[in-house]
C-alpha cells in the first residue's frame, strides 16, 4: 500500500479485535501525521486484552482455568497502557452512545475534541403494523448462549403466570437467533438442552416458540411479527475486573429498525438507547423487576404502540445513508486537523 496516497484510516475496534489494534499502532509509529479514526464498539476499553501475554505470564496460557484468567488480569496494566498510548494519538474515536463516549474518554484520558458519537446504523426497513394484541408476542433475539440472561427471562415469565394466572393464555415468547456451536456447547454440555430442560421444569413448553439460526433476510419479518423485544442481558462478572462495558447491541438496533419497542436490562448503554420513549429498563439480574415490566406491558398494551412509533422514528433517523453522511463529516474533519 502506498500510504502517502491515503488521506485517512478508519478501523473497527472491539473486544478481541487485535489485528486492527496492532495495525493502528504500527501506522501511528510509521506515519505519525496520518489521520487515524476508529469506531469503538466496546468502550470503556479498545480491545480489553493483549494478543500475547508477556513472559513469564505467558506460561499460564496453556494451563487449566483459572490460571490463564489470572494471568490476563495481572497483564492488564500493560494492556491498558498500550490502549491509552494508541487512543491518545487517534484523531477521532467514534462511539455509538454518549455513555460509551464518556466512559472511553475518562478511562483512556482523551480530549473532548477527539470524541464523536454516531448511533448504531440500521437498514431502511419498511414499517409493518403491529400484529393482533392477543396473544402478546414477546421476542428474545440474538445469540443464544450463556451470559445473555435468557434464564432470567424464563424465570420472570413463569413468575408472571404464578402471580397472574389469567395472563397465561395471552402471552407467547419466541427465542430467536444464532446458536454458535462453540458458544452453545460448554464444559457442562449443550446450553440449548439446558434451556429446554428449564422450560419444561417451569411449565412453559406450550408457550415458547423457537427460531434458531435465523437467515438474515428473515430477521425483519420475524421481529415485526412480534410486539416487543426483550433483552435480559447481564454484564460479565469476569469482565468487571477489567472495566465497565458500555457498548450497545445489534439486536437492539434491529428492534429500532423494525419499529418495535424493547424491554431491556440496564446493562451496557441500554438505558440511553431506550430513553427515547421506545421501551423500558429494569435492573440487570432482577428477575422480579423483569416480571414487573412484563406485567406492566400486559396490563398497559397501549404502551406497545407508543414504543413502536418512537422506535420507527429512531429507525428512520438512523438509516445507513444518514450514518454514512455522519462518518463522511468525521473523516473530513480528521483530515483538516492534520
Positions of the model-derived regions?
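Helix-loop-beta element that forms the nucleotide-linked donor phosphate-binding surface
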Residues: 85-95, 101-122
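Conserved acidic donor-binding segment of nucleotide-sugar-dependent glycosyltransferases
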Residues: 276, 280-287, 295-302, 316
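A short, well-ordered alpha-helix in the C-terminal region of glycosyltransferases
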Residues: 296, 303-317, 329
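Nucleotide-activated donor-binding/catalytic signature segment of Leloir-type glycosyltransferases, i.e.
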Residues: 187-220
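Acidic donor-binding loop of glycosyltransferase active sites
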Residues: 224-246, 260
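Conserved donor-binding/catalytic core segment of Leloir-type glycosyltransferases
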Residues: 131-148, 154-157, 173-176
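Membrane-proximal helix-turn-helix segments that form the acceptor-binding/catalytic region
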Residues: 29-30, 56-93
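Short acidic/histidine- and often glycine-rich active-site loop of Leloir-type glycosyltransferases
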Residues: 257, 266-281
Amino acid at each position: 500500500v502506498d500510504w502517502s496516497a491515503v488521506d485517512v484510516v478508519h478501523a473497527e475496534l472491539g473486544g478481541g479485535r487485535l489485528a486492527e489494534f496492532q495495525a493502528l499502532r504500527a501506522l501511528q509509529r510509521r506515519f505519525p501525521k496520518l489521520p487515524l479514526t476508529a469506531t469503538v464498539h466496546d468502550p470503556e476499553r479498545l480491545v480489553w486484552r493483549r494478543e500475547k501475554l508477556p513472559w513469564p505470564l505467558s506460561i499460564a496460557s496453556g494451563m487449566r482455568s483459572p490460571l490463564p484468567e489470572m494471568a490476563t488480569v495481572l497483564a492488564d496494566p500493560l494492556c491498558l497502557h498500550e490502549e491509552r498510548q494508541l487512543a491518545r494519538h487517534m484523531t477521532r474515536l467514534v462511539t455509538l452512545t454518549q455513555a460509551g463516549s464518556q466512559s472511553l474518554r475518562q478511562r483512556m484520558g482523551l480530549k473532548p475534541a477527539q470524541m464523536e458519537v454516531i448511533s448504531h446504523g440500521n437498514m431502511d426497513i419498511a414499517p409493518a403494523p403491529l400484529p393482533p394484541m392477543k396473544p402478546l408476542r414477546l421476542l428474545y433475539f440474538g445469540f443464544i448462549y450463556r451470559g445473555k440472561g435468557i434464564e432470567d427471562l424464563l424465570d420472570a415469565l413463569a413468575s408472571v403466570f404464578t402471580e397472574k394466572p389469567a395472563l397465561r393464555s395471552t402471552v407467547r415468547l419466541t427465542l430467536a437467533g444464532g446458536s454458535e456451536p462453540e458458544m452453545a456447547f460448554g464444559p457442562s454440555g449443550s446450553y440449548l438442552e439446558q434451556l429446554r430442560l428449564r422450560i419444561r421444569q417451569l411449565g412453559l413448553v406450550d408457550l415458547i416458540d423457537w427460531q434458531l439460526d435465523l437467515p438474515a433476510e428473515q430477521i425483519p419479518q420475524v421481529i415485526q411479527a412480534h410486539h416487543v423485544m426483550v433483552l435480559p442481558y447481564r454484564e460479565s462478572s469476569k469482565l468487571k475486573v477489567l472495566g465497565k462495558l458500555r457498548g450497545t447491541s445489534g439486536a437492539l438496533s434491529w428492534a429500532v429498525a423494525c419499529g418495535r419497542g424493547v424491554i431491556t436490562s440496564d446493562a451496557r448503554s441500554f438505558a440511553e438507547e431506550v430513553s427515547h420513549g421506545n421501551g423500558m429498563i429494569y435492573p440487570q439480574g432482577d428477575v422480579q423487576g423483569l416480571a414487573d415490566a412484563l406485567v406492566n406491558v400486559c396490563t398497559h398494551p397501549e404502551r406497545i404502540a407508543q414504543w413502536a412509533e418512537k422506535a420507527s422514528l429512531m429507525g428512520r433517523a438512523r438509516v445507513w445513508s444518514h450514518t454514512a453522511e455522519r462518518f463522511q463529516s468525521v473523516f473530513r474533519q480528521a483530515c483538516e486537523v492534520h
